Amino acid sequence: MCGIVGAVAERNVQGILLEGLRRLEYRGYDSAGMAVLSDDARLNRRRAVGKVAALEASLDAGPLEGRVGIAHTRWATHGRPTEQNAHPHQSGESLAVVHNGIIENHETLKAELESQGYVFTSQTDTEVIAHLLAREFNRTQDLLEAVRQAVTLLDGAYALAVTHRSQPSLIVGARKGSPLVVGVGIGESFLASDPLALLPVTDRFIYLQEGDVVRIARGEPVAVFDAAGECQERSVHTYEHGDGAATKDGYRHFMLKEIHEQPQVVAAALEGRLSERRALIESFGSEAEAIFSQVRQVHIVACGTSYHAGLVARYWLEKYAGIPAQVEVASEYRYRRVVVPDGTLFVTLSQSGETADTLAALRFARERGYVGSLAICNVPGSSLVRESDLTLMTQAGPEIGVASTKAFTSQLVALMLLTLSLGRLNGMDESRQAEIVQALRTLPGAITQVLGLDGAIETLSMAFAEKHHALFLGRGSHFPIALEGALKLKEISYIHAEAYPAGELKHGPLALVDSEMPVISVAPNDELLEKLKSNLQEVRARGGELFVFADESVRLEEAEGVHVLRLPHVDEALAPILYTLPLQLLSYHAAVLKGTDVDQPRNLAKSVTVE
C-alpha cells in the first residue's frame, strides 16, 4: 500500500522518480506526487489525483528540474483521494515529506502543533509529520537530527523520506512497521518501498531494519543509524531476479504472465530441497531439525490468499504428518487470548514479508512460548524473514499483479515440504513420503498441461460475462481451493462470489441456487468424490448451472447446464495445487470480459503494510 521513491543523484531525478512510481503502481494507490529540490534550493512540488499518468501529464507541461527529490503514490486512509491530501506534504516552502503507514496519535500531535501556530491544509496524518519535522528542524538546524527527534514522538507505523531546502544535497529516511530500502548506485543513492522501483538505476540494496534512520547525500556513503542512534553497517544485497520481472513479456497482463510462470516457479521452489525419497529438512535452516524434532502442533497465521494456503496445509499436516494444526487470520489472532500447547511451531505465510498484521502477529507470538517461528516468504531481507527463527523462501520471483497467483502455488509447495519434513520426524510412512516426493518432481509438467487448457477455460468464462454472483464448492483439502477461487473472482472481476464446503449446501447456500447463480466445483478423484457428486446433483435439481474441473478419470458427463473440464491425474496430495490453476484462469478471463483493471483492481493493494 502506497509507494515511496527518493533519489540523490548527479543528474535530473524527475525521470528516475516517475519511473519508480510507475513500477510501484501494482501496490495500489489513488493519487501521486513529487517534490524536487532545484539547484538553487527551491522546493517545487506537483501532485495529481488518479493514475501516475496524470502526474506525468502535469510534469510534461511543466517539468521539475533538480538532482534531489522524493515521490509517492498514496492509498487513502486519512482523508479522501484529493490533490490536497496527496503526498508529498510540506511545512512551509522548505520541508517536504512522503510517508507510508498510519500515525495513531496524529490527533494529539495535531492539536499540539496547531496551538504552536502551525496551519494544516489537508485531512491527512502525514501533514502532522511534516509540521513536526519542521518544528524539530527549527530547533536543531539538522535534518538527520530532526528526523531522529520527530520519530520518537510518533505512535504507529511509518516509512518516511524527507528533504529540506537548507540541506539541498540529501534525503533522510526512516522506517518502523513499514518497509523501506536503500538503493546503492555509483555516486548516487536512492530510497524506495520496494526494490522493483529502483531496478532501472541499481541492483544493489540495503534493507533497512526496524527503527533505522538513514541519510543519503550526494558524494557521500550511505549512513544508517539504528533506533538507539548508533551508526550501523548494513549488508548490501544484490537483487537476483533481474529487471524482466517488472515487464509483461508480451502478455496482456502481469496476472496472466504470472499464471503461466507457475511451472518454472514450482520447479524453483523444489530446487535443491528434495533427495530421492524425502524432503530435506536443512532447507528450512541450520536449526530446523532441532526445532522440528520438538514440534507436536502447528499454528499457521496469515492473511488473504496466504490464509487459504494455510488452510490447505492443515489438512496435509494432520493427514500425512499426524500433527494437529490450527490456522488463524493474522488480524484476529493477535487480539485473542491464544492458548499455546507445549511443542507448538509458529508459522507465518506472506508473499511480501511486510504484511502488517502478520508481522504484528509474529511479534505477539514471541512472548507466547512457541518452540520456534518459521516464515514462508517470497522476499529475502523482508522483516518477516529477518525476525523469524527459520525461513523457507518460495522462490516465486516478483509478483506484480495484485491478485496473487504464483505466490500462492509456491506457498503450497513450501507447505508440502514442511509437511514431509515434520512427517519424517513424526513417523510418516516412508513409502508414502517417497510417492509424494516423486509426484512433486512431476508437478511442473502437470501444471504445464493444465495451462494448455487456457483456451477452453476462456470459453467457459464467457458464461460469467453478465453474472453478478457465483458459488464455489469443494470438499476436504479442496474447500480452501474453492475459497481461493471465490476470492480471485471477486477481487478482479467484481463478481460477488462465495465458497462453501459442498456438504454444507443444504444448510443454507442451496437457497441461492438458480439459473442465474453459476456454481463452480473442483472434483479430484479422491475419497470424497462420490459425496461431492451427490452435492452437485442437488445443484442440478434446482436449475443451477455447473462448471466442474474434474480428474480425467472421473465419470461425470457433460449435459445441458453441466460443463466439465478434465484435468490430468496427479497424486491426491498435490491435487489442491493443480486445481488452483483453472480457477485462476477462469477468474482472469471473466475479469477481462468484464473490462476491469485486472492487475490493479479497485480499492485493493498488493502489499498491505498498514493495519
Residue ranges and their predicted role:
Residues 1-248, 252-253, 261-296, 335, ...:
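Conserved short alpha-helical segments that host acidic/polar catalytic motifs at enzyme active sites
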Residues 7-10, 99, 119, 136-140, ...:
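Hydrophobic alpha-helical scaffolding
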Residues 67-84, 275-290, 313-349, 355, ...:
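Glycine-rich oxoanion-binding loops at beta->alpha junctions
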Residues 181-206, 305, 331-366, 504-538, ...:
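Glycine-rich, anion-gripping cofactor-binding loops and their flanking helix/strand elements
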Residues 255, 560, 566, 570-611:
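Generic C-terminus detector
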Residues 262-266, 270-299, 380, 390-518, ...:
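Active-site phosphate/pyrophosphate-binding segments
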Residues 293-442, 524-527, 531-565, 586:
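Glycine-rich phosphate-binding loops that contact phosphosugars or nucleotide phosphates
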